[in-house]
From Swiss-Prot:
Keyword Metal-binding: yes
Name of protein: Enolase
Encoding gene (name): ENO
Record's subcellular location: Cytoplasm
MF term (GO), any: phosphopyruvate hydratase activity
Amino acid sequence: MVAIVEVKAREILDSRGNPTVEVDLKTEQGCFRAAVPSGASTGIYEALELRDGDKTRYNGKGVLKAVENVNKVLAPALVGKDCREQAALDRLMVEELDGSKNEWGWSKSVLGANAILAVSMALCRAGAAAKGIPLYKYVAQLAGHEAPEFVLPVPCFNVLNGGKHAGNSLAMQEFMVAPVGARSFGEALRMGAEVYQALQRLLKAKFGLAATNVGDEGGFAPDIKDPREALGLLVEAIRAAGHEGKVKIMADVAASEFYSKEAKSYDLDFKSPAADAHRLLTGDQLKDLFKEWSEEFPIVSIEDPFDQDDFSSYAALTAEIGSKVQVVGDDLLVTNPARIRKALQHKACNALLLKVNQIGSITEAIEACKLAQASGWGVMVSHRSGETEDSFIADLVVGLRTGQIKTGAPCRSERLCKYNQLLRIEEQLQGRCTYAGENFRNPSN
């Protein structure tokens, strides 16, 4: 037994200057720290992120209540327990100490997913240390991969920002480049950085220096409105960097952010102050637009193409382009096994975006991943737009063998710490791993 001797939480700041929860969990082997991220475009079905609501402090976004819940509720219950009991202790926190539920499962609405997850992540680090193995190997064991061949993921770099992540006119949230033709993760990182730098030069020449300002995730945020123009810029940057054919395009539409439930339509110009009914698109019209783009551009993945409840549009798109394009559910699924099962029934998508803070514990995140993988889906591990310097998801993606990760542009330290940790893992494995490459949708085959 390796007993937990202390658990302490504090309020720190994330990459947007908003408060978040950090936890130190101590055993006889040392102190293990974790910090949780937060999103800007959040799905309505995500587990509850507990905020204080005190408008006189951090505009109501303080997390002192969540910190108190760790220190006064979770800590006393965990001290003395074996840190290697990840699943049992996650269940204790989620089902007994919090206990709140909704139609989709455990909602964490009493203690807060941000409180529980911070402890769960720190606990995972302590468990790995107790077993004397790297975090990614411990995650693999927790997932039931006893002797896995490790897979290094394709990094999906968000190089053009729009939506809620940037102050420009672009409705769609992320335009990414994915070096599927690289031979290793290290080479993929180089390719991504070279495309990013080529794009910077291109934007400066076309639109001026202001166009190279960056958004929340390190991508550029030029004041363009047409998604087709954004896609064309990526094609041009890939060509200029000398990586045509080896670097593909991915998009995160985040369509729930510009969907009107009343009008049952999508507004690709939702940031414009002037309302115009003529620019609204039905789900079917938007589907046809995605299909057109997938034929015109080297697009291999589209995330959240429709509203989080528009299962029929998802299913129609997946049926039409799903064999050659990954259709990813983020707000649709919120890393929730119950939502994944519903999507499977509807044949709504063919990939899961895995965000640990959407579900609120490492055990539940692993369960969601395994369900998706067992169903033949792809799985992409993801950061959030409000990030910290915690690199946990780098080890998570290797341990779960999902083959793809998105954690921003090759810019801003809270993004690069994940990519750099993956470089270290690849170096540590020294040939005892493969790079997912073009098999990113199903790297185990």
